[in-house]
């Protein structure tokens, strides 16, 4: 961990300057939205507890500020290839049939390329849903 000049701690997990809270937003944004809604507070508490135990205390307010701001990165990355992905699924008459937690994501008999596209759509659904929920829960507007 490297102390920054502003109130954040940096984690070089991905050889970049994403802060710790942003990394956790990244780690959790593919979780099932209902699961994250239910368990987010306990997950955050555990992360802060572990960092404190390891000698790197982070205040919950600082964590939440960086966490909610970090959702912007996931929102942008999630939408980056979305038009091409959805256009492809639409041209195959699949877009209209997608459902949350689509069982086709784990259909071993489906063409692997098509299954990958359906999984991509599900991951993007989770990304947008989780990011919007986090933004609402932790007052993104005020943090921004």
Give the role of each language-model region.
Residues 14-56, 73-100:
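Active-site activation/catalytic loop segments of kinase-like enzymes and analogous catalytic loops
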Residues 6, 30, 70:
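Alpha-helical, largely C-terminal catalytic domains
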Residues 38-42, 61, 122:
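Generic alpha-helical secondary structure signal
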Residues 57-74, 116:
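All-alpha amphipathic helical-bundle segments outside canonical DNA-binding/catalytic cores
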């Amino acid at each position: 961990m490297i102390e920054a000049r502003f109130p954040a701690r940096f984690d070089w997990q991905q050889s970049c300057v994403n802060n710790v809270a942003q990394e956790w937003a990244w780690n959790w944004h593919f979780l099932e939205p209902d699961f994250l809604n239910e368990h987010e507070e306990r997950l955050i508490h555990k992360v802060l507890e572990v960092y404190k135990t390891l000698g790197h205390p982070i205040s919950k307010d600082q964590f939440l500020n960086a966490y909610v701001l970090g959702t912007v990165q996931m929102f942008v990355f999630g939408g980056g290839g979305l038009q091409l992905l959805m256009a492809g699924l639409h041209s195959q008459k699949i877009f209209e049939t997608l459902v949350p937690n689509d069982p086709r994501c784990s259909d071993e008999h489906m063409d692997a390329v098509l299954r990958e596209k359906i999984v991509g759509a599900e991951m993007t659904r989770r990304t947008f849903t989780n990011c919007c929920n986090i933004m609402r829960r932790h007052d993104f507007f005020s943090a921004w």
